């Protein structure tokens, strides 16, 4: 196994030095900040992560403003009330990524988020209160309650939100059968 210092040295050289490497490191948000983020933002980030799976992030990010408009700025109650006709129309919208299962997952996830909001007051409060030493359990909770958040999507979503988490390599996932 390669020593961490060797890996770190390679990374510093690759990105242009210590400062460049430091600027790329993830800085988790404190729990108080997570609790203050609106539920609409969590729903947006969750579904952006879902659409990024299997596609280039640049493609998804370029189209995301159209998603914000199409999904009413990801207002949880509004999206949860979308009917199948609304979603079928969106699945044909050329401004969006026309992936029917993922389009329908947005509504499913809004409904799941409503349940968490009803139980804990907000999705952010739920994330903020989750014990740091139970990270994998949080991944499993997200995978169970939400649609299209399997594999590395749950930890990637948490990382995008600023929740402290780690990411498993494909090697680890294949050998541990966690997901």
Where are these regions (language model features)?
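N-terminal polyanion-binding entry modules of DNA glycosylases/AP lyases
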Residues: 1-96, 103
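Alpha-helical ds-nucleic-acid-binding substructure associated with the helix-hairpin-helix region
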Residues: 72-145
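PRPP/pyrophosphate-binding module of the type I phosphoribosyltransferase fold
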Residues: 153
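Phosphate-backbone recognition surface of nucleic-acid-processing proteins
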Residues: 139-147, 157-179
């Amino acid at each position: 196994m390669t020593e961490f210092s060797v890996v770190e040295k390679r990374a510093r050289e690759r990105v242009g030095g210590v400062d460049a490497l430091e600027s790329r490191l993830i800085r988790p948000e404190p729990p108080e900040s997570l609790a203050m983020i609106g539920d609409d933002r969590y729903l947006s980030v969750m579904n952006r992560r879902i659409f990024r799976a299997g596609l280039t992030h640049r493609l998804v990010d370029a189209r995301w403003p159209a998603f914000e408009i199409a999904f009413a700025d990801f207002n949880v109650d509004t999206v949860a009330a979308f009917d199948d006709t609304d979603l079928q129309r969106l699945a044909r919208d050329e401004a969006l990524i026309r992936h029917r299962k993922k389009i329908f997952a947005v509504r499913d996830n809004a409904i799941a988020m409503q349940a968490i909001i009803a139980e804990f007051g907000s999705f952010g409060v739920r994330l903020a209160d989750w014990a740091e030493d139970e990270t994998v359990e949080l991944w499993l909770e997200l995978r169970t309650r939400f649609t299209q958040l399997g594999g590395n999507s749950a930890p990637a979503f948490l990382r995008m939100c600023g929740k402290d988490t780690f990411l498993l390599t494909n090697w680890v996932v294949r050998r541990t059968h966690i997901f």
